[in-house]
Amino acid sequence: EIPASVETIEATAFKGCSSLATVTFEKGSQLKTIGGGYYSYSSSYYYGAFCQLKNLMTVDMSACTQIETIGECAFYGDFELRLFKIGTEIPPTCENYAFSGINPYSVLKVPSGCADAYKAATEWKRFASTTGLDE
């Protein structure tokens, strides 16, 4: 469980944590930013905070109500990501490829009454279905 006091998760924070299957955030989370990035010259290098974690299946950010930005490639290549919950009512800004390569059957759960806003927002459209947290 990531402590409520964390405001930023930097790029590559979980790089190499291949056994990580679930990420949860403590109630009252102050998280505002999840870092990321991408570099390409002769070969590509992705450095999102949670990118390319082959066993990551669930991210529960339902306690996070203040997210502003999800960085480039933050969850890139998380092929097993099936459930993503977020408590922020206004869809956070997602930079390029934030959710590229996630499971094609992935579910996004958002605060009640906010599903349409997430469905219309760039990058959030990558989720197969979007429903309320209470559904």
Which ranges hold each PLM region?
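Helix-loop-beta element that forms the nucleotide-linked donor phosphate-binding surface
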Residues: 121-126
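Short glycine-/acidic-enriched loop or helix-start segments at secondary-structure transitions
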Residues: 95-96, 119-120
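Structural signature of tandem-repeat unit edges
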Residues: 1-8, 18-33, 41-45, 51-69, ...
